[in-house]
Amino acid sequence: MSSNSWADVSESERAPSGGGWGYSRPSRTNYVPPHLRSRTPSSEFVAPSPGNNDRGGYGGANSGYGGRGQGYGGRGSGYGGRGGPVGGWNARSGGWDRRDTETNPFGNDGNADPAVNEQENTVINFEAYEDIPIETSGDNVPPPVNTFAEIDLGEALNLNIQRCKYVKPTPVQRNAIPILAAGRDLMACAQTGSGKTAAFCFPIISGIMKDQHIERPRGVRGVYPLAVILSPTRELACQIHDEARKFSYQTGVKVVVAYGGTPVNQQIRELERGVDILVATPGRLNDLLERGRVSLQMVRFLALDEADRMLDMGFEPQIRKIVQQMDMPPPGVRQTMLFSATFPREIQRLASDFLSNYIFLAVGRVGSSTDLIVQRVEFVHDSDKRSHLMDLLHAQRENGNQGKQALTLVFVETKKGADSLENWLCINGFPATTIHGDRSQQEREVALRSFKTGRTPILVATDVAARGLDIPHVAHVVNFDLPNDIDDYVHRIGRTGRAGNSGLATAFFNDNNTTMAKPLAELMQEANQEVPDWLTRYASRASFGGGKNRRSGGRFGGRDFRRESFSRGGGGADYYGGGGGYGGVPGGGYGAMPGGYGPVPGGGYGNVPGGGYAPYGRGGGAYYGPGGYGTVPNQGYGPGVASAWD
C-alpha cells in the first residue's frame, strides 16, 4: 500500500469535526498550530455511498472517552480545574477519593470480579505461543518471568489483571515486563495481537502507583502527566486508552486520551480534571503543547506504539519536537519504551536517538512456524478483482456458521477505491462499511463498532486500519490491492490469527506487484506456506534488492542493528564511512573520529573520552567505551546474554 493513506490520516487528524460530541460554540476562525500552517489542505471529501452499511445517524450523546462523572478526587487539589473539585497526585488526601465514583470499565454489575465483555475479550491460545523464538540483546538483561505474580505490580493492578481474564503472560509480556519493571529502556519487536499494550501499560501503571507522593506544580494552567503514550492513529489511541482504563481501574491512576478529529476544548476539559497517563496522537499532543495546556517536564515514562510507522511515515518531525525540543526530560532520566511488529534497521537507527542503554527484544511471529495464518496468493488481473472477491465471499458465506458472513477485512490502496468497493458490495447483497482518512472520527468509530458486532461483516479499509487495532474474530483478510512494502503486508495479515488463533489471508497479485514477488515468496516460505510456482518464477526474475523489501531478521520483525554494526567491525563493512565502524574514519564508531560513538577518540556514546551515553558520561567506558557495546574494553558486544528462549 502506498503512503497516501497515512498522509490522509495525518491530514484528517488536523481537521477536527464537531459532530456527535454534544458540543457547539459560536463560529470563529479555527486555531491552526504554527507547525501545521504551511500544510496543504486534504483532498476533497468523498460523499458517503448509499446501501446497507453503517452510515446512518450517530448517537452522539457520549461526551467522549473517559466519560462524565469520573471526578478526579476531593477538594483542595493542585490542578485548579474548572467546573468542580478535582484532585490527583498533587494532593494525595483527595486524589484517591475519585476511586469511589470512578466509572467501572468492566461493566456496571458492581461485583468484585466483573466480567469483561466476552465479545471483546479474545480468548488467547497460549499453546500456540509455546515454541515461539525470542531474542534479547543488550547489557544485563533481566530474566523473563512465567507468571504475573513473580513481579510486584501492586495489589490493585493484579486484581485488574484477573478481571481481564489474563491467566499467564504472553511471550512479549514475560520478557518486556521485567525489563521495564527494572527501569530499563526497551525496543520491542512483537507481532500485533501478542499483548504489547499490556506489556507497556502494566509497568507504567505500577511505577506510578509505587511513587505516590510525587509533587507537581500547583495553580498553573497546564497539566503535568507522568506518562505519555503515543500512537499513529486515533483508533489505536482510543484502543490503548480503553485498555489502560481497565488496567488502572481503582488504582488511583487517571488515563486520558487526546486525538485529532474531535473538538480540542472537550479534551482540554477532560485533561483539567487530572491526568497521570496521557494517550495521544502526535498532532494533537503538539497542538496541546503549543497552547500551553500540557507540560512534559514531569514525564517519567514515554511509550511509542507502532513506533516504526510513526518514524517512517512522516511523523518523525512531530515526534522529535515532542521528545527533544519541548520540556520532556532526556533519555536516562525518563524511561522510554518502543513497540512495534516490525523494526527495520534504518528505523532502529532513528529510534535509538530516543533511548538510553536500551535492551532490544524480538519475539518471533505467531504463525511463522505454524499454520495459524494460512496465506494464499492468487493471480488476478485488476479488471477481475471484484468478481474474484465476490466468489470468495460467496464461498465464505456458504461455509459460515448458519449462513452468516464471517468478519472479512479487505485492504485497498485509495480512499475513493474503498468507497467505490463498499458501494458495489452493498448493491450486490454484502453489507459493508469503510474506514479511511476522509471519514470523520465519529464515522470511523461507528464503522469499527458496526464491523466488530457483525452488523456489517465486511470492512473495506486503507492502511489506516492496518496498524495496531485489535479487532477480535477477523476470519479473513483480503489484500485486494497489495501494498508496496512487505512490512505493511505483515501488519495487514496480522489483523487475523490474533492472540494465537487461526485465520486466513488472501492476496491478489498481478503484474503491477512484481516488486513484491521476492519478499512475499520469502515470507511465505519462512511461514511454511505453500508458494505457487508462478510466484516463485516472478521472484526469481526480480532483481536483487528490488522493491521496498526492508525486512530482516527471518522469523522476527527485526533484529538488533547494533549486533550487525559491531560484529562487522571494519574492512568496508561500515554503514556511513569507509574502512570500519559507523564513522567516516577507519576503525571509527558513529562519530567522526576513531573509537566509538562520540566525536572524541575512544569516545563511547558521549563527547568525553571513554565516555558514556550523551554528555552525562553515562557508562563511563564500562558500557560504551573503546571497542563497542561490551562490558569489557575492546570486546565488541560483550559477554553472551543468557537465553530468553522458552
From Swiss-Prot:
CDD domains in UniProt: DEADc_DDX3_DDX4 (cd17967), SF2_C_DEAD (cd18787)
Principal EC category: hydrolase
Keyword match Acetylation: yes
Annotated positions of the N-acetylserine modification: S2
Reaction catalysis annotation: ATP + H2O = ADP + phosphate + H(+)
Domain Helicase ATP-binding stretches: 177-361
Similarity annotation: Belongs to the DEAD box helicase family. DDX3/DED1 subfamily.
Protein name as catalogued: DEAD-box ATP-dependent RNA helicase 52
